[in-house]
Swiss-Prot record:
Part of the 30S ribosomal subunit. Forms a loose heterodimer with protein S19. Forms two bridges to the 50S subunit in the 70S ribosome. The lineage of its organism: Bacteria, Pseudomonadati, Pseudomonadota, Gammaproteobacteria, Alteromonadales. Belongs to the universal ribosomal protein uS13 family. It comes from Shewanella violacea (strain JCM 10179 / CIP 106290 / LMG 19151 / DSS12). It holds the Pfam family Ribosomal_S13. GO terms for biological process: translation. One of its GO terms (molecular function) is tRNA binding. Located at the top of the head of the 30S subunit, it contacts several helices of the 16S rRNA. In the 70S ribosome it contacts the 23S rRNA (bridge B1a) and protein L5 of the 50S subunit (bridge B1b), connecting the 2 subunits; these bridges are implicated in subunit movement. Contacts the tRNAs in the A and P-sites. This is Small ribosomal subunit protein uS13. Residues 94-118 are annotated as: Disordered. Keywords: Ribonucleoprotein, Ribosomal protein, RNA-binding, rRNA-binding, tRNA-binding. One of its GO terms (cellular component) is small ribosomal subunit.
């Protein structure tokens, strides 16, 4: 298994699919990386040489991925909560942020129903 950005990439998968195992790299970005490094998208990881894997490592290192990206996202959410803006308040209350109705739906975000006390 090749190790890129601290993640073990599966050998038996195609390059594009294997790169999507890294948090922060989807299909589009994986294709862009393959095009920039001139590595075939349908080549399996085990078929690549060490030099090609090193080139992939350098290309992935140009993007914010894995722990840095997770930290950045959580810091953005924390910033919204500290500001006390509408989105921050909705995050704090674990409610939907983008205008969805909450009278009848939003069970995933709100959690299981709480029984009514009399």
């Amino acid at each position: 298994m090749a190790r890129i950005a601290g993640i073990n990439i599966p050998d038996q998968k195609h390059t594009v699919i294997a790169l999507t195992g890294i948090f922060g790299i989807g299909r589009t970005r994986a294709r862009a990386i393959c095009a920039a490094t001139s590595i075939a998208e349908d080549a399996k990881i085990k078929e690549l040489s060490e030099a090609q894997i090193d080139i992939l490592r350098e290309a992935v290192a140009e993007y914010t991925v894995e722990g840095d990206l997770r930290r950045e996202v959580s810091m953005n959410i924390k910033r919204l909560m500290d500001l006390g803006c509408y989105r921050g308040i909705r995050h704090r209350r674990s409610l939907p942020l983008r205008g969805q109705r909450t009278k009848t739906n939003a069970r995933t975000r709100k959690g299981p129903r709480k029984p009514i006390r009399k």
